[in-house]
Protein backbone atom coordinates (compact mmCIF):
# COMPACT_ATOMS: atom_id res chain seq x y z
CA UNK A 1 0.00 0.00 0.00
CA UNK A 2 2.80 2.47 0.85
CA UNK A 3 4.30 1.95 -2.58
CA UNK A 4 1.24 3.50 -4.19
CA UNK A 5 -0.12 6.10 -1.78
CA UNK A 6 3.06 7.36 -0.14
CA UNK A 7 3.35 8.09 3.57
CA UNK A 8 3.26 10.98 5.97
CA UNK A 9 6.05 13.43 6.65
CA UNK A 10 8.95 12.48 8.89
CA UNK A 11 11.24 14.19 11.35
CA UNK A 12 14.79 13.34 12.38
CA UNK A 13 15.82 14.01 15.95
CA UNK A 14 17.40 17.42 16.32
CA UNK A 15 15.78 18.86 13.19
CA UNK A 16 12.66 20.95 12.81
CA UNK A 17 12.33 20.48 9.04
CA UNK A 18 10.51 17.69 7.29
CA UNK A 19 12.58 15.01 5.62
CA UNK A 20 12.87 15.90 1.96
CA UNK A 21 13.08 19.64 2.66
CA UNK A 22 15.22 21.21 -0.03
CA UNK A 23 16.79 23.45 2.60
CA UNK A 24 18.77 20.58 4.11
CA UNK A 25 22.38 20.30 3.03
CA UNK A 26 22.20 16.57 2.44
CA UNK A 27 23.31 14.94 -0.80
CA UNK A 28 19.71 13.84 -1.43
CA UNK A 29 17.98 16.66 -3.21
CA UNK A 30 14.40 15.75 -4.02
CA UNK A 31 11.59 15.10 -1.54
CA UNK A 32 10.97 11.37 -1.50
CA UNK A 33 7.19 11.50 -1.45
CA UNK A 34 6.57 14.17 -4.05
CA UNK A 35 4.79 11.80 -6.41
CA UNK A 36 1.63 12.61 -8.29
CA UNK A 37 -1.52 12.29 -6.19
CA UNK A 38 -3.89 12.24 -9.17
CA UNK A 39 -5.75 9.13 -8.15
CA UNK A 40 -7.92 8.74 -11.25
CA UNK A 41 -11.20 8.75 -9.31
CA UNK A 42 -14.05 7.09 -11.16
CA UNK A 43 -17.45 8.62 -11.72
CA UNK A 44 -19.54 6.27 -9.61
CA UNK A 45 -18.46 3.11 -11.41
CA UNK A 46 -17.22 0.24 -9.29
CA UNK A 47 -14.57 -2.02 -10.82
CA UNK A 48 -14.04 -5.60 -9.71
CA UNK A 49 -10.84 -6.50 -11.54
CA UNK A 50 -8.65 -6.24 -8.44
CA UNK A 51 -10.31 -8.68 -6.04
CA UNK A 52 -11.62 -12.21 -5.94
CA UNK A 53 -14.20 -14.03 -3.84
CA UNK A 54 -12.90 -17.44 -2.77
CA UNK A 55 -15.05 -20.50 -2.17
CA UNK A 56 -14.48 -20.26 1.59
CA UNK A 57 -16.05 -16.78 1.63
CA UNK A 58 -12.82 -14.82 1.99
CA UNK A 59 -12.17 -11.86 -0.28
CA UNK A 60 -8.73 -11.46 -1.85
CA UNK A 61 -7.69 -7.95 -2.88
CA UNK A 62 -4.36 -9.09 -4.32
CA UNK A 63 -5.67 -10.77 -7.46
CA UNK A 64 -5.33 -7.80 -9.80
CA UNK A 65 -2.18 -7.28 -11.86
CA UNK A 66 -0.92 -4.73 -9.29
CA UNK A 67 -1.35 -7.15 -6.40
CA UNK A 68 -3.05 -4.50 -4.27
CA UNK A 69 -6.34 -2.55 -4.13
CA UNK A 70 -6.61 1.24 -3.86
CA UNK A 71 -10.10 2.81 -4.06
CA UNK A 72 -10.47 5.01 -7.12
CA UNK A 73 -7.28 3.83 -8.85
CA UNK A 74 -7.03 1.46 -11.78
CA UNK A 75 -4.59 -1.44 -11.58
CA UNK A 76 -2.49 0.12 -14.35
CA UNK A 77 -2.32 3.45 -12.51
CA UNK A 78 -1.30 1.70 -9.28
CA UNK A 79 1.58 0.00 -11.07
CA UNK A 80 2.81 3.28 -12.55
CA UNK A 81 2.69 5.15 -9.23
CA UNK A 82 4.44 2.27 -7.49
CA UNK A 83 7.21 2.30 -10.09
CA UNK A 84 7.66 6.05 -9.68
CA UNK A 85 7.94 5.86 -5.89
CA UNK A 86 10.21 2.83 -5.77
CA UNK A 87 12.51 4.12 -8.51
CA UNK A 88 13.16 7.26 -6.47
CA UNK A 89 13.74 5.23 -3.34
CA UNK A 90 16.06 2.84 -5.16
CA UNK A 91 18.17 5.76 -6.38
CA UNK A 92 18.57 7.04 -2.82
CA UNK A 93 19.30 3.50 -1.60
CA UNK A 94 22.04 3.08 -4.19
CA UNK A 95 23.57 6.35 -3.04
CA UNK A 96 23.46 5.18 0.58
CA UNK A 97 25.01 1.85 -0.38
CA UNK A 98 27.88 3.54 -2.20
CA UNK A 99 28.50 5.70 0.86
CA UNK A 100 28.52 2.67 3.16
CA UNK A 101 30.94 0.84 0.89
CA UNK A 102 33.29 3.82 0.68
CA UNK A 103 33.31 4.12 4.47
CA UNK A 104 33.41 0.38 5.14
CA UNK A 105 30.16 0.61 7.13
CA UNK A 106 28.22 -2.65 7.48
CA UNK A 107 24.52 -1.70 7.54
CA UNK A 108 21.69 -4.01 8.62
CA UNK A 109 17.97 -3.28 8.31
CA UNK A 110 16.06 -4.91 11.21
CA UNK A 111 12.38 -5.47 10.45
CA UNK A 112 9.57 -7.12 12.42
CA UNK A 113 6.13 -6.76 13.93
CA UNK A 114 5.82 -4.40 16.91
CA UNK A 115 6.89 -6.11 20.12
CA UNK A 116 9.14 -8.79 18.63
CA UNK A 117 12.06 -7.63 20.75
CA UNK A 118 14.12 -5.81 18.09
CA UNK A 119 15.32 -3.08 20.43
CA UNK A 120 16.14 -5.57 23.20
CA UNK A 121 18.11 -7.60 20.65
CA UNK A 122 20.10 -4.53 19.61
CA UNK A 123 20.74 -3.47 23.21
CA UNK A 124 22.04 -6.94 24.08
CA UNK A 125 24.21 -7.06 20.96
CA UNK A 126 25.76 -3.64 21.58
CA UNK A 127 26.58 -4.50 25.19
CA UNK A 128 28.06 -7.90 24.36
CA UNK A 129 30.13 -6.65 21.41
CA UNK A 130 31.31 -3.33 22.87
CA UNK A 131 34.94 -4.52 22.84
CA UNK A 132 34.68 -6.23 19.44
CA UNK A 133 32.70 -3.92 17.17
CA UNK A 134 31.73 -0.25 17.00
CA UNK A 135 27.97 0.00 16.48
CA UNK A 136 25.69 2.99 15.88
CA UNK A 137 21.92 2.87 15.45
CA UNK A 138 19.15 4.57 13.49
CA UNK A 139 15.79 4.07 15.20
CA UNK A 140 12.50 4.30 13.32
CA UNK A 141 9.12 4.77 15.03
CA UNK A 142 5.99 6.75 14.31
CA UNK A 143 6.41 8.77 17.52
CA UNK A 144 8.72 9.16 20.58
CA UNK A 145 12.48 8.77 20.93
CA UNK A 146 12.17 6.03 23.55
CA UNK A 147 14.11 3.42 21.61
CA UNK A 148 16.96 5.78 20.72
CA UNK A 149 17.22 6.65 24.42
CA UNK A 150 17.49 2.95 25.29
CA UNK A 151 20.28 2.53 22.76
CA UNK A 152 22.19 5.55 24.10
CA UNK A 153 22.10 4.07 27.60
CA UNK A 154 24.47 1.37 26.29
CA UNK A 155 26.99 4.04 25.30
CA UNK A 156 26.31 3.64 21.58
CA UNK A 157 25.42 6.57 19.37
CA UNK A 158 21.85 6.65 18.06
CA UNK A 159 19.49 8.92 16.19
CA UNK A 160 15.69 8.72 16.09
CA UNK A 161 13.53 9.09 12.99
CA UNK A 162 9.83 9.68 13.67
CA UNK A 163 7.78 8.81 10.61
CA UNK A 164 4.50 10.37 11.78
CA UNK A 165 1.72 8.67 9.86
CA UNK A 166 4.28 6.81 7.76
CA UNK A 167 4.68 3.11 8.50
CA UNK A 168 8.24 2.49 7.33
CA UNK A 169 11.62 4.10 6.82
CA UNK A 170 12.79 4.94 3.32
CA UNK A 171 16.24 5.49 1.85
CA UNK A 172 15.87 9.27 1.77
CA UNK A 173 15.17 9.45 5.52
CA UNK A 174 18.09 7.12 6.23
CA UNK A 175 20.43 9.20 4.08
CA UNK A 176 19.69 12.29 6.16
CA UNK A 177 20.11 10.35 9.40
CA UNK A 178 23.43 8.87 8.27
CA UNK A 179 24.75 12.34 7.51
CA UNK A 180 23.91 13.46 11.06
CA UNK A 181 24.99 10.25 12.79
CA UNK A 182 28.24 9.87 10.80
CA UNK A 183 29.01 6.20 11.60
CA UNK A 184 32.71 5.48 12.08
CA UNK A 185 34.53 3.96 9.09
CA UNK A 186 34.73 0.20 9.52
CA UNK A 187 31.80 0.13 11.97
CA UNK A 188 28.36 -1.49 11.95
CA UNK A 189 25.15 0.48 11.49
CA UNK A 190 21.94 -1.05 12.80
CA UNK A 191 18.76 0.40 11.29
CA UNK A 192 15.70 -0.55 13.34
CA UNK A 193 12.72 -0.09 11.05
CA UNK A 194 9.19 0.78 12.13
CA UNK A 195 7.37 -2.26 13.55
CA UNK A 196 5.49 -3.48 10.47
CA UNK A 197 5.75 -6.72 8.50
CA UNK A 198 4.25 -5.27 5.30
CA UNK A 199 5.47 -1.91 4.04
CA UNK A 200 9.21 -2.03 4.88
CA UNK A 201 9.63 -5.10 2.66
CA UNK A 202 9.50 -3.04 -0.53
CA UNK A 203 11.89 -0.26 0.51
CA UNK A 204 15.62 -0.78 0.10
CA UNK A 205 17.55 1.47 2.50
CA UNK A 206 21.00 0.69 1.11
CA UNK A 207 21.61 -2.02 3.71
CA UNK A 208 23.79 -5.08 3.27
CA UNK A 209 21.06 -7.36 4.63
CA UNK A 210 17.49 -7.29 5.88
CA UNK A 211 17.16 -9.16 9.18
CA UNK A 212 13.60 -10.16 10.07
CA UNK A 213 12.96 -10.72 13.78
CA UNK A 214 10.05 -12.97 14.73
CA UNK A 215 8.97 -13.58 18.31
CA UNK A 216 7.97 -17.13 19.23
CA UNK A 217 4.75 -15.62 20.62
CA UNK A 218 3.58 -14.64 17.13
CA UNK A 219 2.71 -18.03 15.62
CA UNK A 220 4.40 -20.45 13.23
CA UNK A 221 2.44 -19.29 10.18
CA UNK A 222 3.60 -15.66 10.25
CA UNK A 223 6.02 -16.19 7.30
CA UNK A 224 3.11 -17.46 5.20
CA UNK A 225 0.84 -14.57 6.18
CA UNK A 226 3.47 -11.93 5.40
CA UNK A 227 5.59 -13.56 2.68
CA UNK A 228 7.03 -10.40 1.11
CA UNK A 229 9.04 -9.56 4.22
CA UNK A 230 10.47 -13.04 4.63
CA UNK A 231 11.25 -13.23 0.92
CA UNK A 232 13.21 -9.96 1.16
CA UNK A 233 15.23 -10.97 4.23
CA UNK A 234 18.57 -12.78 4.37
CA UNK A 235 18.33 -13.80 8.03
CA UNK A 236 15.40 -14.67 10.29
CA UNK A 237 15.95 -14.43 14.04
CA UNK A 238 13.42 -16.29 16.19
CA UNK A 239 13.50 -14.28 19.40
CA UNK A 240 12.20 -14.90 22.95
CA UNK A 241 13.30 -18.54 22.94
CA UNK A 242 13.22 -18.46 26.75
CA UNK A 243 9.42 -18.51 26.49
CA UNK A 244 9.28 -21.74 24.47
CA UNK A 245 8.66 -24.00 27.50
CA UNK A 246 5.50 -21.99 28.19
CA UNK A 247 4.16 -21.90 24.62
CA UNK A 248 2.63 -24.25 22.09
CA UNK A 249 5.08 -23.15 19.38
CA UNK A 250 6.77 -25.51 16.92
CA UNK A 251 10.12 -23.98 15.98
CA UNK A 252 10.77 -26.47 13.20
CA UNK A 253 7.37 -25.82 11.63
CA UNK A 254 7.93 -22.06 11.71
CA UNK A 255 11.34 -22.39 10.07
CA UNK A 256 9.90 -24.74 7.44
CA UNK A 257 7.22 -22.16 6.62
CA UNK A 258 9.86 -19.45 6.27
CA UNK A 259 11.94 -21.63 3.96
CA UNK A 260 8.87 -22.30 1.80
CA UNK A 261 8.77 -18.55 1.17
CA UNK A 262 12.54 -18.07 0.91
CA UNK A 263 14.71 -21.20 0.52
CA UNK A 264 17.93 -19.19 0.93
CA UNK A 265 16.88 -17.68 4.27
CA UNK A 266 19.26 -18.31 7.16
CA UNK A 267 17.64 -18.83 10.57
CA UNK A 268 18.72 -18.47 14.19
CA UNK A 269 16.84 -19.04 17.45
CA UNK A 270 17.81 -16.72 20.31
CA UNK A 271 16.72 -15.08 23.52
CA UNK A 272 17.77 -11.45 23.81
CA UNK A 273 16.78 -11.61 27.48
CA UNK A 274 18.90 -14.59 28.57
CA UNK A 275 21.54 -14.51 25.84
CA UNK A 276 20.68 -17.98 24.55
CA UNK A 277 21.82 -18.36 20.94
CA UNK A 278 23.24 -14.84 20.72
CA UNK A 279 26.81 -15.98 20.04
CA UNK A 280 25.57 -17.61 16.84
CA UNK A 281 24.14 -14.25 15.78
CA UNK A 282 27.40 -12.50 16.64
CA UNK A 283 29.33 -15.03 14.56
CA UNK A 284 26.96 -14.44 11.63
CA UNK A 285 27.38 -10.69 12.08
CA UNK A 286 31.18 -10.80 12.08
CA UNK A 287 31.43 -13.22 9.14
CA UNK A 288 28.90 -11.24 7.09
CA UNK A 289 30.68 -7.96 7.81
CA UNK A 290 34.03 -9.47 6.78
CA UNK A 291 32.57 -10.82 3.53
CA UNK A 292 31.00 -7.47 2.76
CA UNK A 293 34.32 -5.72 3.35
CA UNK A 294 36.09 -8.08 0.95
CA UNK A 295 33.46 -7.53 -1.75
CA UNK A 296 33.74 -3.77 -1.32
CA UNK A 297 37.53 -3.88 -1.77
CA UNK A 298 37.24 -6.05 -4.87
CA UNK A 299 34.62 -3.72 -6.35
Curated annotation (Swiss-Prot):
Region (G-domain): 107-268
Gene Ontology process terms (BP): protein maturation
Lineage: superkingdom: Bacteria
Compositional bias segments (type: Basic and acidic residues): 31-57
Amino-acid positions noted as binding Ni(2+) 1 in the UniProt annotation, renumbered to this chain: 2, 5, 7
Keyword Cytoplasm: no
Signal peptide stretch: none
Sequence similarity: Belongs to the SIMIBI class G3E GTPase family. HypB/HupM subfamily.
Stored NCBIfam families: hypB (TIGR00073), PRK10463.1 (NF007775)
Name recorded for this polypeptide: Hydrogenase maturation factor HypB
Natural source organism: Rhizobium leguminosarum bv. viciae
Species classification: Bacteria, Pseudomonadati, Pseudomonadota, Alphaproteobacteria, Hyphomicrobiales
Amino acid sequence: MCTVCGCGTSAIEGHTHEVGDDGHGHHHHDGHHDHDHDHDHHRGDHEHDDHHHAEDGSVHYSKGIAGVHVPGMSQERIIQVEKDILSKNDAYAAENRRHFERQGVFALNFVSSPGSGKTSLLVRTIKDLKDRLSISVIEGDQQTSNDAARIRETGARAIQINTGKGCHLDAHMVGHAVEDLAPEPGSALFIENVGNLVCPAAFDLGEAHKVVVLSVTEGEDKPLKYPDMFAAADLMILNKADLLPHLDFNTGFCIANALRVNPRLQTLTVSARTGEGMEAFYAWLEVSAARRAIRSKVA
